[in-house]
Amino acid sequence: MTNPVLNPALPAMAAAPVAATPSAVGSAGIVAPVFLRFDEPLPLASGQTLNGYELAIETYGTLNAQRTNAVLVCHALNASHHVAGVSADNPKDVGWWDNMVGPGKPVDTNRYFVIGVNNLGSCFGSTGPASINPATGRPWGAAFPVLTVEDWVRAQARVADHFGIERFAAVMGGSLGGMQALSWAITCPQRVANCVVVASTPRLSAQNIGFNEVARRAIITDPDFHGGDYYAHGTVPGRGLSVARMIGHITYLSDDDMAEKFGRTRREPAADGAYRYGYDVEFEVESYLRYQGEKFSRYFDANTYLLITRALDYFDPARATGGDLARALAPATADFLLVSFSTDWRFPPERSREMVRALLKNGSPVTYAEIDAPHGHDAFLLDDARYHAVVRGYYERIARELGLNGAVAPEGNSA
């Protein structure tokens, strides 16, 4: 077991009790992150080694005495450890899956102890390209090692060790988070009782790799990128990162959803309705995408975007089994819940059905739901009653099996 330590240089809130304090029914309450430092070197898939790193985490609910009620939530590309509740330092910062996790919600924190971990390489508190490289005293920048989904799982496992959690009641995630959950089930089968994979895929298609490459080129060719060492130049490749986000955002929405939201609505058309015959914003959808891109470029790190999209590209567990997904999933002993959405063209339902067929071939217990929803890939983040009913029902079944039908009394869990 790896023994992490809290970073003493971090603000006092980093040493606060891990369990969130509920402030209202249905809310995970006001939460603050905890920063765990791991000094044991982490071997990476690339052959490199990360000698010491920090992970930002948040938790919700209470770990029971048997340590059997823990749920790990893995995040997608631009999310973080802040899964639910309200940030202590920003009352407007609500967790990215707050509609899913909390008291009385599908993942009920009256029963479960939920952990959110900010992945290595991210820019929300865990060690990443913007962190100081102890060997140079300067930001890692382009020298930060390329990571894989499997690397993230190995790092997350050390968080489980820290809490003394031998086996998660469930590991879950949507999109890229679903890939991590799947990797957990394959690489750490004895530590995962249930695997919940939402709006995900066992590998990226050529089209998806193509989208990621176009986004990366937008960043890399930005004059302010400076080969990834823009920190030293005091610049931010904001134009490239903004375009990358615009490209990605289009893939998260369905055609029908965009048609309903924007259609061909004009942005401040001329009095006579004529086109402006220029290259500034003409349509509402253009204004929306520019806004999303510019907002994203103000809070996300460009090197992190490169790193995470490449990790997406590399995820392909069946690569080691000659493309045989059933063989790749054979080590898994967990029960599975897979959920897909009808209009998700980024990771379409057929990719989930492919995983279901492979799991059934192996004799794995599988529950599968395909939700008819108009919102595209981003549907996994939304409060859809049918979707949430499926997840709620699955977690209620886990609770019955574990005897978690009552609320877990707080015991002052801390990092």
UniProtKB/Swiss-Prot annotation:
Family per record: Belongs to the AB hydrolase superfamily. MetX family.
Classification via NCBIfam families: homoserO_Ac_trn, PRK00175.1
Pathway noted in the entry: Amino-acid biosynthesis; L-methionine biosynthesis via de novo pathway; O-succinyl-L-homoserine from L-homoserine: step 1/1
SUPFAM superfamilies for this protein: alpha/beta-Hydrolases
Catalysed conversion reaction: L-homoserine + succinyl-CoA = O-succinyl-L-homoserine + CoA
Chief localisation class: cytoplasm
Function: Transfers a succinyl group from succinyl-CoA to L-homoserine, forming succinyl-L-homoserine.
Name recorded for this polypeptide: Homoserine O-succinyltransferase
UniProt xrefs under Pfam families: Abhydrolase_1
GO molecular function terms attached to this record: homoserine O-acetyltransferase activity; homoserine O-succinyltransferase activity
Domain AB hydrolase-1: 69-383
Binding site for substrate: R245, D378
EC numbers for this chain: 2.3.1.46
Any single Gene Ontology cellular-component annotation: cytoplasm
Example GO BP: methionine biosynthetic process
